[in-house]
Amino acid sequence: MIRTLLLSTLVAGALSCGVSTYAPDMSRMLGGEEARPNSWPWQVSLQYSSNGQWYHTCGGSLIANSWVLTAAHCISSSGIYRVMLGQHNLYVAESGSLAVSVSKIVVHKDWNSDQVSKGNDIALLKLANPVSLTDKIQLACLPPAGTILPNNYPCYVTGWGRLQTNGALPDDLKQGQLLVVDYATCSSSGWWGSTVKTNMICAGGDGVICTCNGDSGGPLNCQASDGRWEVHGIGSLTSVLGCNYYYKPSIFTRVSNYNDWINSVIANN
């Protein structure tokens, strides 16, 4: 019990979490632009190995020194993975960046890749070695359990995903503002309908900014009243109609629905 409580404090409410040495450039947020280098220091690139090379596949968030939060659909049972931390341009050797192998993967037991709309698209990656925090590598905060963000709450998506449907993958980390769409709206006909569940968050839907292929698993960053950034969402779904489609906001796994699961996995592994 003591161990579980301690982990809950360290992971979900760490005193040093959610603060960046290099503050995000908020003036760049509205149009989906290149992020200020290392301004989202919990953002990681999840990469898989193929023929001796490493390739970006998804994003993720560092939530403890040995643990990364990502989406279950990013994981293949046969894959070999590593994460890149403290990186801005994925194709340039950068001072302060770090590559760490993934030693264990825990996918939520209720995730079903054949029934994606049921949700539970969440996984935890244990790193082979705990990482030291630096000005370029920091922990994300998790939101308090059960938190539901109000309609139009401004959050910010970050990642190395495609800039548009079938578009190119960027070299540099991108960022963009997404407004939360409440469940009542997002689950209505003409929006996502019954695809959306209460264990998800919708954000965007303006036809301009959204997540796209390669952003999956990455954070939906929302600022708390104390100024710290909390990861409220994990990139999960976009519309088959395209990445930037009206009334089809990006869908994220709602992290505040899984605090107990996250703490339990870390405590027992």
From Swiss-Prot:
InterPro entries on file: Peptidase_S1_Elastase_sf, Peptidase_S1_PA, Peptidase_S1_PA_chymotrypsin, Peptidase_S1A, Trypsin_dom, TRYPSIN_HIS, TRYPSIN_SER
Keyword Secreted: yes
Entries under SMART domains matching the protein: Tryp_SPc
Chief location: secreted
E.C. number: 3.4.21.71
Disulfide linkage: C58-C74, C155-C222, C186-C202, C212-C243
Record keywords, A-Z: Disulfide bond, Hydrolase, Protease, Secreted, Serine protease, Signal, Zymogen
Signal peptide: 1-16
GO CC annotation: extracellular region; extracellular space
Compartments (UniProt record): Secreted
The protein's enzyme class: hydrolase
Catalytic activity: Preferential cleavage: Leu-|-Xaa, Met-|-Xaa and Phe-|-Xaa. Hydrolyzes elastin
Propeptide: 17-28
Tissues expressing the protein: Pancreas.
Pfam family, any one: Trypsin
Its biological purpose: Acts upon elastin.
Record's protein name: Chymotrypsin-like elastase family member 2B
Protein encoded by which gene: CELA2B
